[in-house]
């Protein structure tokens, strides 16, 4: 039986998570709901047509205010308060928190209060149980004690794996890095 996923925030990250699940984890993960302040029609259009990554290869339709992707209904909600999203009623195992708003674990916990079993925050977080960078410290994850985890930042995910290889093989005494980042809505 597939792990049920809910996505809170259907912007760039939320849509890419959705596409990755559809294209690579079909039968293993299943997106059962999204929560975004845009309506289903707008979310369907943004999922289907992407000027950076191209068109979504499957079918995307709207029926009764929900998305229908490749024939499967995905519930659509437009709640500002995560505690009001019926994750528990939908049997959601994991919520991907990708709004950029609920990055403090005390706020992200509202998803669990609404019935989700775990939360993955797609940004740097405060008070999370663990920050995970795949290929660097993902072996530290313990499902018995890590319920709200952060996926770190895009910069960390780019730099840390390469730095780990260099450090493990030759050592790093000092380091400096810089990043150029597109404008975001919290700047």
Model-derived features: positions:
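N-terminal Rossmann-like NAD(P) cofactor-binding subdomain of oxidoreductases
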Residues: 1-187
């Amino acid at each position: 039986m597939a792990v049920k996923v809910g996505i809170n925030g259907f912007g760039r990250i939320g849509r890419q998570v959705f596409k990755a699940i559809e294209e690579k984890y079909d039968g293993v993960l299943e997106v059962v709901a999204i929560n975004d302040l845009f309506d289903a029609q707008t979310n369907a259009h943004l999922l289907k047509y992407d000027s950076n990554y191209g068109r979504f290869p499957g079918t995307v339709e709207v029926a009764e205010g929900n998305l229908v992707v490749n024939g499967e209904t995905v519930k659509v909600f437009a709640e500002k308060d995560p505690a009001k999203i019926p994750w528990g009623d939908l049997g959601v195992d994991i919520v991907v928190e990708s709004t950029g708003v609920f990055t403090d674990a005390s706020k992200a916990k509202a998803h669990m209060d609404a019935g989700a079993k775990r939360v993955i925050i797609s940004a740097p977080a405060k008070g999370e149980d663990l920050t995970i960078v795949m290929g660097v410290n993902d072996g530290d994850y313990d499902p018995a004690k890590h319920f709200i985890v952060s996926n770190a930042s895009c910069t960390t995910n780019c730099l840390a794996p390469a730095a780990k290889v260099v450090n493990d093989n030759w050592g790093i005494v000092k380091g400096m890095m810089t990043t150029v980042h597109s404008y975001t809505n919290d700047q």
